């Protein structure tokens, strides 16, 4: 498994693009996905979630995820990357928790979320307080509408997955075999 670490934690970044296969990646941003055409598969930890047009999903900071596209035809989505510091009242919870099921189906997506996603894709270079307000609206719905679980519950107990996750989370540090073995609960 090829893992990518992306530095996406400064302000806001938005992309409206064709969906493609994306290998497992990890970044410090809150990632929001809103499917505008077709379908996409969102993989979070060991789970794969099917998304269709109008579905909304969120991936919290430092959670390994990937994308796959199986549908033929036009598949497009809005991808928003928000710096966690934009939402100080949610910052601590964003570090500890993750949605158990990261998708809200089209028929249940609150209009506030849709309006905020559409506003954010057009507001990248304007007033940061307005950007912050839209981010707060989205997270307020996420934390009230989605069941949260401890981030440690996302993923797998598989030793390979755990090793990749450890390296991804500690790649900026010098990695020692004995420290990694201790963290993974295996002998050196």
Which residues does each PLM region occupy?
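A hydrophobic/aromatic-rich effector-binding and dimerization subdomain
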Residues: 1-16, 59-126, 140-148
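Generic protein-terminus/edge-of-domain signal
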Residues: 1-56, 71
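Hydrophobic packing within well-folded, soluble alpha/beta domains
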Residues: 51-54, 59, 167, 180
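Short, Lys/Arg-enriched, Trp-marked, Pro/Gly-tolerant hinge/linker segments that flank
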Residues: 98-108, 122-135, 140-184
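Short coil turns linking two alpha-helices in DNA-binding domains
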Residues: 187-188
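Glycine-centered loop/turn positions within well-structured domains
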Residues: 40, 65, 173
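Aromatic-acidic/polar surface patches that form glycan- and anion
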Residues: 25, 69, 128-131
């Amino acid at each position: 498994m090829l893992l990518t670490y992306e530095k996406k934690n400064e302000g806001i970044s938005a992309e409206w693009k064709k969906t493609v296969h994306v290998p497992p990646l990890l970044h410090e941003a809150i990632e929001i996905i809103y499917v505008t055409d077709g379908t996409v598969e969102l993989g979070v930890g060991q789970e794969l979630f099917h998304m269709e047009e109008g579905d909304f999903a969120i991936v919290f900071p430092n959670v390994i995820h990937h994308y796959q596209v199986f549908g033929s035809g036009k598949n497009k989505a809005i991808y928003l990357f928000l710096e966690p510091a934009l939402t100080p009242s949610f910052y601590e919870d964003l570090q500890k928790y993750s949605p158990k099921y990261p998708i809200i189906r089209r028929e249940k997506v609150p209009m506030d979320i849709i309006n905020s996603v559409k506003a954010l894709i057009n507001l990248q270079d304007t007033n940061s307080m307005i950007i912050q307000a839209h981010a707060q609206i989205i997270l307020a719905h996420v934390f009230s509408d989605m069941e949260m679980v401890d981030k440690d519950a996302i993923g797998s107990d598989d030793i390979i997955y755990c090793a990749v996750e450890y390296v991804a989370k500690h790649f900026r540090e010098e990695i020692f075999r004995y420290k990694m073995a201790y963290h993974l609960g295996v002998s050196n």
